């Protein structure tokens, strides 16, 4: 639980609900749970009593925040499969912007270009999917091997994203991480369902330079959090986030 909460804090998920399910064989101390969340600096509401589904639904809706501005389309894909008679279908959520039938899109990384054949939201055919929607995107004209977990769909011609192979970052280390990174350490970066392997080549104070085995796709404007972990770091694998991307 502790590492999960550190991941939430690092991802800046400051608001949420934690529901305590009391089992018949063991009892969970709500005050202890509140202490753990307090130590993680997460101001989530702790729910002790059972809620009706509609009550919990209303609580979740209360967390909804409208995004400002007209962000470009980004759809991180977590599943891909083929449907006979339709073709390649990607499943993901609309992180920003909107996507419509017949839009010309591009798959990043790779730059494969295709056209949206159809869209489904909640198993219903739709003409358009907006930010926050969980969407199935059927594509025409793309190689099935160009789409997979960690792929991102954007509008063709968009300059929203960039691929970096070696970059210098500011490392924002979580206060729970006692281990210190060193040159030649192998780290992993997680963003938008990508999980990339990199090696640290230079350290200068809070700044670190990382060479990635395969390109890391990030937003050009620097928004979007990149979580850095080290899989053999025990007991805490999460180091924090990197920001201020500067390609080498």
PLM regions: where:
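Switch II of P-loop NTPase G domains
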Residues: 1-10
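Non-catalytic alpha-helical coupling and interface elements of nucleotide-dependent molecular machines
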Residues: 13, 38, 42, 58-65, ...
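C-terminal effector/interaction modules appended to NTPase cores
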Residues: 90, 94-101, 105-248
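Signal for well-folded cores of large energy- and translation-related assemblies
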Residues: 9, 61-68, 82, 95, ...
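Long, hydrophobic alpha/beta structural blocks
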Residues: 10, 14-17
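Amphipathic alpha-helical transducer elements in NTP-driven molecular machines
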Residues: 2, 27, 53-57, 113, ...
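Canonical P-loop GTPase G-domain recognition
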Residues: 17, 21-84
């Amino acid at each position: 639980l502790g590492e999960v909460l550190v991941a939430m804090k690092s991802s800046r998920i400051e608001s949420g609900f934690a529901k305590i399910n009391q089992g018949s064989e063991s009892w969970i101390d709500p005050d202890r749970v509140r202490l753990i969340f307090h130590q993680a600096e997460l101001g989530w509401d702790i729910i002790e009593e059972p809620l009706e589904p509609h009550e919990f639904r209303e609580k979740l809706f209360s967390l909804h925040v409208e995004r400002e501005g007209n962000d470009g389309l980004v759809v991180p894909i977590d599943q891909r499969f083929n449907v006979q008679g339709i073709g390649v279908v990607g499943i993901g959520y609309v992180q920003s912007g909107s996507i419509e039938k017949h839009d010309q899109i591009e798959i990043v990384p790779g730059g494969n270009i295709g056209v949206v054949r159809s869209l489904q939201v909640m198993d219903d055919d739709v003409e358009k999917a907006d930010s926050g929607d969980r969407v199935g995107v059927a594509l025409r004209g793309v190689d099935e091997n160009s789409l997979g977990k960690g792929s991102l769909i954007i509008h063709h011609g968009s300059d929203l994203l960039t691929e970096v192979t070696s970059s210098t970052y500011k490392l924002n280390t979580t206060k729970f991480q006692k281990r210190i990174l060193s040159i030649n350490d192998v780290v992993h970066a997680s963003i938008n369902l990508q999980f990339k392997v990199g090696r640290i080549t230079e350290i200068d104070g809070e700044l670190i330079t990382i060479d990635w085995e395969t390109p890391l796709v990030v937003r050009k404007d620097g928004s979007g959090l990149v979580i850095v972990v080290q899989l053999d770091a025990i007991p805490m694998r999460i180091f924090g986030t990197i920001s201020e991307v500067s390609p080498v």
